[in-house]
Amino acid sequence: MIDCASDILGLVDVQPTFMPGGELAVAEGDATVPVINRLLRQFDHAFATQDWHPPGHSSFASAHPGHQPYDVITMPYGPQVLWPDHALQGSANAAFHPDVDLTKVEVIVRKGFHPQIDSYSTFFENDRRTPTGLDGWLRQRGFRRVFLAGLATDFCVAWSAEDAIRLGYEVVMMQDACRGIGVPLGNGRTTMDEAHERLVSLGVQMITSDQLGA
């Protein structure tokens, strides 16, 4: 199923800050690590993203007096969920998880370092216009299909998948190599439900590692 010339595995924010014990812990986030390592053995090429925030970043609830984590405010680029302080530049929890084998990772994209704008997607800042440079690198290398794994399903992975589709890539989400946050939206729905419906409607393929032969 994998075309070693045109397929690439993308690892999204596989950092302790998003795992149990981290500042913005995703339930079972650490369970993605062994699956990701199995996937890495199947691919010849990989890239990784790293959330990398300065202190006082505008997406932190602590930067907005009177607000709490998971409140939603309006920023110049649109709605913004406010997060606990996390992925602080240079901190141990902002590093990649130490058990992830980065041998095949050919490029690392740091995101979220601009103080006044958040960055979920591997391709664009949250204004959906400012590029990270990843698209140009992938095109120069001739990659056409992106397999995504990492954290969190309903934010950084989902936004990455959506932008990749918009840019003309085929996208496969490795469901057992991802975990989500699930922010409540009301009516019993969460951001996980919304993300899944949106991505399926866009044509993102959802599979698990056993379907890939990993």
Where on the chain are the PLM-derived regions?
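Short HxH-centered metal-ligating active-site micro-motif
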Residues: Q50
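Active-site-adjacent betaalpha module
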Residues: M1-G10, V14-F18, G22-A25, A31-H45, ...
